[in-house]
Amino acid sequence: MNGRHVGLAVIVAAVWGVNFVAIDGGLSHYPPLLFTALRFLVAAVPAVFLVGRPGVPWRYVLAGGLVLGALQFGLLFEGMKAGMPPGLSSLVQQGQAVFTAVFAAALLRERIGRRRLAGLAVAVAGMAVAALDQASRGGSAPLGAFALVVGAAAAFGFSNIITRRAAPPDALRWMVWVSAVPPLPLALLSVLTEGPRADLEALTTFSPGAVGSLLYVAWGATLLGFGLWGRLLRSHDASVVAPFSLLVPVFGMSSAWLLRGEALTWLSGAAAVLVISGIAIASLRRAPAATAAAPGWRADADADGRAGRDGGGPARRPLPPYAAGAAGSPVRPS
């Protein structure tokens, strides 16, 4: 990877890390479910009319939109609104790699090797330390908020499996279409649970900071982030690109400290070291043998069982970042 692409990968990680601070800012104005609905609405329109069809069966678009959009981000926004700090949230969301491995083993019959299992155990220990850190901040509400964000990480992991089964050919187009699914059900759920008066007040009261947060999470983290990430995956193997996502909680925690005054305790620092190093152990692999398909590429076999360009089958095409994540690389942002 050349210097320019390294810079782009770091920029994407920074955009996704700071996204948690933007979410925290938007939640000071919008009710969480309404904010989630608006985030996906702004990301989907008008982009959905410009990017072309998703290139996957519609059932996967619907499932991805409901699990990733409504469930994952609904839980994340509710947890942060309930008191989960943005920096710690960015770290706990990396637990999606653990849930992805569990779901892949249970649903796809993937084998978890000893090295990967050890790394995931270290990451789980880091999440336990993060829970202690959240508990030390006081009260039962923060622990409940922590549970919501862990639930969001679990939904992240399940959506990885959906995306892997869908195998969309373009990451940005996939995200735009998935974003078109959650706005309506989330808006209805917001009216029912958060109340029409709170929603109407948030929509009719102008706040430059809230609007800026909304545009950042919709256009910056979703459209710009996935557009650049997909470009990098088209140029490099997923095993080269995916490790840069380990920088997301680094940028998330540091930006929360700088911009929101979130305390960095020794517990949160220990949790960060354990989670990031555990996911790195589980995800970073040795270079494959010369005869093997490169990581991040799917070798589609032809009728004779031959695969890839050299075998006479169809040319390999890069997996999108979510599908690569299902194989164990921590590539999911928020």
What spans do the regions from the language model cover?
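Glycine-/small-residue-enriched transmembrane alpha-helix faces in small-molecule transporters
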Residues: M1-L34, A135-R165, L184-L188, A293-A301, ...
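Hydrophobic alpha-helical transmembrane segments of multi-pass integral membrane proteins
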Residues: R4, P31-V48, A63, G119-A125, ...
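Specific transmembrane alpha-helical segments of multi-pass solute transporters/efflux pumps
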Residues: A14-F20, V48-Q93, A101-F103, V129, ...
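Membrane-interface helix-cap regions at the ends of transmembrane helices
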Residues: V18-G25, H29, V42-P57, V124-S140, ...
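Hydrophobic/aromatic residues within transmembrane alpha-helices
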Residues: G26, F35, G79, A106-L108, ...
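Specific alpha-helical transmembrane segments that line the substrate/conduction pathway
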Residues: L34-V45, F77-R111, R116, L120, ...
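Hydrophobic transmembrane alpha-helices of multi-pass small-molecule transport proteins
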Residues: L41, A47, F103, I112-Q134, ...
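Membrane-interface capping segments at transmembrane-helix boundaries
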Residues: R234, S283-G296
